[in-house]
Amino acid sequence: MDAIVTFFQENGHNLLVQTWQHLFISLSAVILGIAVAVPTGILLTRSPKVANFVIGVVSVLQTVPSLAILAFIIPFLGVGTLPAIIALFIYALLPILRNTFIGVRGVDKNLIESGRGMGMTNWQLIVNVEIPNSISVIMAGIRLSAVYVIAWATLASYIGAGGLGDFIFNGLNLYRPDLILGGAIPVTILALVVEFALGKLEYRLTPKAIREAREGGE
């Protein structure tokens, strides 16, 4: 315990810098994942056969070891922050894509037909009916993806991208448990804080009528 306290005292500034790097890399990958996976997931609901193929391909990509992905990217993008973000982006895709597809497909068809009866365009149906009624499922995928990515981002230090993984791998190389814990504890806290914040965001994004209906059902 004394060693850990000493670590935080001696590495306070570096810890803040590495935490910021870790958060930047992780959130950049998740935001890219959202930008690609949510629209793609919505489009795939219009073509279930294509959806099975696309989700299958993304699922296979996620089974590839992260170090293998990094090794594949390095010859094209070199080392540093960008290849780390691209690699993490690949891992961020599946939970968001799958949950968006499942959530939008699960929207009550009567609501969609009612919207069409009111003269809504496809875009209006997506924005006003499908997304609001599937936001909790979509956000569950985003929350899961964010936690995964924050954990996997420790490997970014292997290619010089920085982050809290620097402490962990330095600790492993030097047989310094204090460095290992000094990196692992902030990663865990960061994942919990981001998951909590996204949970609050999900609550805010869920339409009030839907929240009240769920709370009344409980």
Swiss-Prot record:
Tell me the Pfam families matching this sequence: BPD_transp_1
Q: Which Gene3D superfamilies match?
A: MetI-like (1.10.3720.10)
Q: Which GO terms describe its cellular component?
A: plasma membrane
Which biological process terms from the Gene Ontology are attached to this UniProt entry? Answer: glycine betaine transport; transmembrane transport
Q: Which CDD domains match?
A: TM_PBP2
TM regions (residue ranges): 23-43, 48-68, 79-101, 149-169, 179-199
- Membrane topology label: Multi-pass membrane protein
Per UniProt, residues of the ABC transmembrane type-1 domain are 19-198
Q: Please give the chief subcellular localization of this protein.
A: membrane
Q: Tell me its family.
A: Belongs to the binding-protein-dependent transport system permease family.
Q: How does it assemble?
A: The complex is composed of two ATP-binding proteins (OpuCA), two transmembrane proteins (OpuCB and OpuCD) and a solute-binding protein (OpuCC).
Q: What does this protein do?
A: Part of the ABC transporter complex OpuCABCD involved in carnitine uptake. Probably responsible for the translocation of the substrate across the membrane. Involved, with BetL and GbuABC, in osmoprotection and cryoprotection of Listeria. Can also mediate weak glycine betaine transport.
From the Swiss-Prot or TrEMBL record, give the protein name.
Carnitine transport permease protein OpuCB
Please report the organism this UniProt entry assigns to the protein. Listeria monocytogenes serotype 1/2a (strain 10403S)
- The primary gene name is opuCB
